[in-house]
C-alpha cells in the first residue's frame, strides 16, 4: 500500500479555492456545480471540480472524506472519470437536518443512474474503490476499519466482462487507463469545504466470486 500524492494530479474544472499537498486535498465548492447526465431531470451538468490521477492497473483506492454541508445536494467523495458521458461518483448528499443520502451515480453512454440509502449525516466517512478490469466495487465505512458494500458496477467503455475474468485472483491485467480521484460540489446556492486525507492505493483487494 502506498499513500497517494495528488500534487501531480489533473483538475477537471479547477476550483477558485483549493489546497493540494502530499498529505491531503482540500476543495471549497462553488454554487451551481455538479456532475449529472440527462436521467429524470433532462439537464446535463459537468462543471464540478475533480482532481484525478491515472492508472491502467487493477487497484484499491481508499480515502477519508471530512465535510460540513450547508444546503441541499452538497456532496463530496470519490470519482472515476472517462469522459463527460461515462463516469462514476460516490458521496453523501445533504438532504435536510433529519437525514442525508449515501449513494453512488453510475453514468454510462450519457445517462446517470443514482442509487441511495438514507442515513443520519456524519461529519466524515471513508470510501474504498476497487477495480477489476471494467468492473468496480465501491464500499464505505464510518470508522475506517469495517467497510460495507455500496455497489458493484460496470463501465461500458472499458469493455466486456468474461467468465474467465470473474474467476481470476489476482484479476487479469488490464491495459485500459482510467482517471480517478476526488470531487466536491454544491448543486444549489451553497459552498462548503471538503477535505480528503488518508488516501492510499494498493493492488486490488476485491477477490473473485
Regions inferred by a protein language model and the residue ranges of each:
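Extracellular glycan-recognition regions
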Residues: 1-209
Amino acid at each position: 500500500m502506498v499513500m497517494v500524492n495528488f500534487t501531480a494530479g489533473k483538475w477537471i474544472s479547477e476550483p477558485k479555492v483549493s489546497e493540494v499537498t502530499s498529505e491531503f486535498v482540500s476543495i471549497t465548492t462553488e454554487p451551481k456545480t455538479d456532475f449529472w447526465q440527462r436521467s429524470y431531470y433532462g439537464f446535463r451538468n459537468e462543471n464540478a471540480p475533480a482532481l484525478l490521477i491515472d492508472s491502467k492497473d487493477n487497484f484499491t483506492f481508499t480515502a477519508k472524506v471530512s465535510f460540513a454541508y450547508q444546503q441541499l445536494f452538497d456532496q463530496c467523495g470519490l470519482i472515476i472519470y472517462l469522459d463527460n458521458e461515462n463516469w462514476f461518483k460516490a458521496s453523501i448528499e445533504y438532504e435536510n437536518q433529519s437525514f442525508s443520502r449515501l449513494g453512488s451515480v453510475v453514468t454510462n453512454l450519457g445517462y446517470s443512474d443514482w442509487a441511495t440509502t438514507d442515513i443520519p449525516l456524519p461529519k466524515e466517512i471513508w470510501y474504498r474503490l476497487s477495480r477489476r478490469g471494467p468492473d468496480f466495487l465501491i464500499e464505505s465505512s464510518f470508522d475506517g476499519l469495517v467497510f460495507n458494500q455500496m455497489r458493484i458496477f460496470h463501465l461500458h467503455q472499458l469493455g466486456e466482462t468474461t467468465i474467465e475474468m470473474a474467476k481470476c485472483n489476482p484479476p487479469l491485467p488490464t491495459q485500459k487507463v482510467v482517471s480517478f480521484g476526488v470531487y466536491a460540489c454544491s448543486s444549489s446556492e451553497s459552498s462548503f469545504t471538503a477535505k480528503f486525507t488518508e488516501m492510499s492505493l494498493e493492488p486490488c483487494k476485491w477477490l473473485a466470486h
